[in-house]
């Protein structure tokens, strides 16, 4: 039922409550704890309501449903190991609980219901996922820097050491480790040397300041994690029974304030801000004005007019981010006085945990879309490198064939054009022309022609002689290129599609490779081209299912397995 607490959260509450009661300050029989344990071990879960608690005198309402099952109330329901619904008697039989239902003794009812276990149980699950997503966001930011051909100095330890914040230092060190020795970074440095003005001197904020953005969020998540860790190991019912002094202490450990505060901080500050960064990075990656040569919308097909790539995904990301920002409002400032003003202040801890769980789900969807987009960008860089190599070889071949010799076999002045022609290929972004490489309206042919015209203008009096004129070679050069280049480009594409590229994918020797390998090989996702029946949503679904099942943890950790936890030494 949509009005029932998820069974995983109910089971977490049972475990946390057992942990609290085992500490011996709650006045409850050990046999009751054994019964709850048997229910857990036999995968029998009481049905708890989704709503109805303010986590003030603990989570009274949902915890009473566990007590109701233990005492055999006729309306008590549980869910069995195969999802079947059962009454209390069947649950006891299946769990092997002997002796019948419990008749509660003094204090035992309060011991069961007067505590924060439901809120803190759900909060602990939420924070586990949030910690994983925080590390994933660091890793994905580093991969983003690679595919964007970013400048790696943004991770230099001195910059972050001077800022003093530990979360920022950690985020930068993680990214620095992934980028250290990256062939993508080395290739980007060569491009910057070829044409220093081709891209901005400094990368945009979503890349360059990602450690500064993520750093405080990591610290917030760590603080919240520590608060919930303390809460799930605390004694939080009332009154407390101090056997050593023969006292019943009437206090107030039952409010879930640590839950509400930690969940609000995690939701409002951390999760929403991580999502905002992912959206900013995603928007930059799909925009060909910013992404340093990748195709608009990361289209991978031969015909960009028929392949909209990640355009729909970008719209979806805007939707996810908007919903996430809406959820990023604190819950604890909406407290209402309750129980005839006895519970006049309360925590709303479980409500905050539920809303944070919703936010985590949205961030999972955003992480899915972002990860698939990065894998697409990695493959497009591989395609770009192979196609540029093909174009360069073809231009060189045609230049040698057409421009080297004159009509009578003599060396021709146009032979000196080849070097400048190849510089054009090096500087021009492949995806600005590759769908129709010989089109006169695309930049490649225009700039190749301009090189020949410039050389012709410098040829002086030799231009007046048809046997030494460079200008008269332009037509032959272009015609030869139009015959050869489209065939060579298509041949290179087919080799890529058949897994036999001339240049292997650089990602295979990178530290980020385990994540790429998991998405591409283990989950079986493919490059999106618009040429196949499968839709982007099918690829996203594979990754989202894996993230929700916790399968992304191992490959994410594998990316960092060689990291010693410290920044690279300054040198």
From Swiss-Prot:
Domain of life: Eukaryota
Enzyme Commission numbers on file: 4.3.1.24
The keyword Cell membrane is assigned to this record: no
Covalent cross-link site, 5-imidazolinone (Ala-Gly): 56-58
Main location, first listed in the record: cytoplasm
SUPFAM superfamilies: L-aspartase-like
PROSITE patterns according to UniProt: PAL_HISTIDASE
Keywords in alphabetical order: Cytoplasm, Lyase, Phenylalanine catabolism, Phenylpropanoid metabolism
Pfam families: Lyase_aromatic
InterPro entries per the UniProt record, alphabetical: Aromatic_Lyase, Fumarase/histidase_N, L-Aspartase-like, Phe/His_NH3-lyase_AS, Phe_NH3-lyase, Phe_NH3-lyase_shielding_dom_sf
This protein's record includes keyword Cytoplasm: yes
Pathway: Phenylpropanoid metabolism; trans-cinnamate biosynthesis; trans-cinnamate from L-phenylalanine: step 1/1
UniProt-annotated binding residues for (E)-cinnamate: 114, 202, 208, 238, 311, 339, 342
Reaction(s) this enzyme catalyzes, per UniProt: L-phenylalanine = (E)-cinnamate + NH4(+)
Compartments where located: Cytoplasm
GO BP term (any one): L-phenylalanine catabolic process
GO MF terms, alphabetically ordered: phenylalanine ammonia-lyase activity
Cellular component terms (Gene Ontology): cytoplasm
Family as reported in the entry's similarity comment: Belongs to the PAL/histidase family.
Task of the protein: This is a key enzyme of plant metabolism catalyzing the first reaction in the biosynthesis from L-phenylalanine of a wide variety of natural products based on the phenylpropane skeleton.
UniProt xrefs under PANTHER family: HISTIDINE AMMONIA-LYASE
Subunit and partners: Homotetramer.
Descriptive protein name: Phenylalanine ammonia-lyase G4
Organism for this UniProt entry: Populus kitakamiensis (Aspen)
Gene that this polypeptide is encoded by: PALG4
């Amino acid at each position: 039922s949509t009005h029932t607490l998820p069974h995983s959260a109910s089971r977490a509450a049972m475990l946390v409550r057992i942990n609290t009661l085992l500490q011996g300050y709650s006045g409850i029989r050990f046999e009751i704890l054994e019964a709850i344990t048997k229910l857990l071990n036999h995968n029998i879960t009481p049905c708890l309501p989704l709503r109805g608690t303010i986590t003030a005198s603990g989570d009274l309402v949902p915890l009473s449903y566990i007590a109701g099952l233990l005492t055999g109330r006729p309306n008590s329901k549980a869910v069995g190991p195969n999802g079947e619904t059962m009454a209390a008697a069947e649950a006891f039989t299946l769990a092997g609980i002997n002796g019948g239902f419990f008749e509660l003794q003094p204090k035992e009812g309060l011991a069961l219901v007067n505590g924060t276990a439901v809120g803190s149980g759900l909060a602990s699950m939420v924070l586990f996922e949030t910690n994983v997503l925080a590390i994933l966001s660091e890793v994905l930011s580093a991969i983003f820097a690679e595919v964007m051909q970013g400048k790696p100095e943004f991770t230099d330890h001195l910059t972050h050491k001077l800022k003093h914040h530990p979360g920022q230092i950690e985020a930068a060190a993680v990214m620095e480790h992934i980028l250290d020795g990256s062939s993508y970074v080395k290739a980007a440095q060569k491009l910057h040397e070829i044409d220093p003005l081709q891209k901005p001197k400094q990368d945009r904020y979503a890349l360059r300041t990602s450690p500064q953005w993520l750093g405080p969020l990591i610290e917030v998540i760590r603080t919240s994690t520590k608060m919930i860790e303390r809460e799930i190991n605390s004694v939080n019912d009332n009154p407390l029974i101090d056997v050593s002094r023969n006292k019943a202490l009437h206090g107030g450990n039952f409010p879930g304030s640590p839950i509400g505060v930690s969940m609000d901080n995690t939701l409002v500050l951390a999760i929403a801000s991580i999502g905002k960064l992912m959206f900013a990075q995603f928007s930059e990656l799909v925009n060909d004005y910013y992404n340093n040569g990748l195709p608009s919308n990361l289209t991978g097909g031969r015909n960009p007019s028929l392949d909209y790539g990640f355009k729909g995904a970008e719209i979806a990301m805007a939707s996810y981010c908007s919903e996430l920002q809406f959820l990023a409002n604190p819950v604890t400032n909406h407290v209402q006085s309750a129980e005839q003003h006895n519970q006049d202040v309360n925590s709303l801890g479980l409500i905050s945990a539920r809303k944070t769980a919703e936010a985590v789900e949205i961030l999972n969807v955003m992480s899915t879309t972002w990860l698939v987009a990065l894998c697409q960008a990695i493959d497009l860089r591989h395609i770009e490198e192979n196609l540029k190599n093909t174009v360069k070889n073809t231009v060189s071949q045609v230049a040698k064939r057409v421009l080297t010799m004159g009509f009578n076999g003599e060396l021709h002045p146009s032979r000196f054009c080849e070097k400048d022609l190849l510089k054009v290929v090096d500087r021009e972004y492949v995806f600005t022309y590759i769908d129709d490489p010989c089109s006169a309206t695309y930049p490649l042919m225009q700039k190749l022609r301009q090189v020949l015209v410039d050389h012709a203008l410098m040829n002086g009096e030799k231009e007046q002689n048809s046997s030494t004129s460079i200008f008269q070679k332009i037509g032959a050069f272009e015609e030869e290129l139009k015959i050869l280049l489209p065939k060579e480009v298509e041949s290179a594409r087919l080799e890529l599609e058949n897994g036999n590229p001339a240049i292997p994918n650089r990602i295979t020797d990178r530290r980020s490779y385990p994540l790429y390998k998991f998405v591409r090989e283990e989950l079986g996702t493919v490059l999106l081209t618009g040429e196949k029946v499968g839709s982007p949503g099918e690829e996203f679904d594979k990754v989202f299912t894996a993230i929700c099942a916790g399968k992304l943890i191992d490959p994410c950790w594998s990316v960092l397995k060689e990291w010693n936890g410290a920044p690279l030494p300054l040198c």
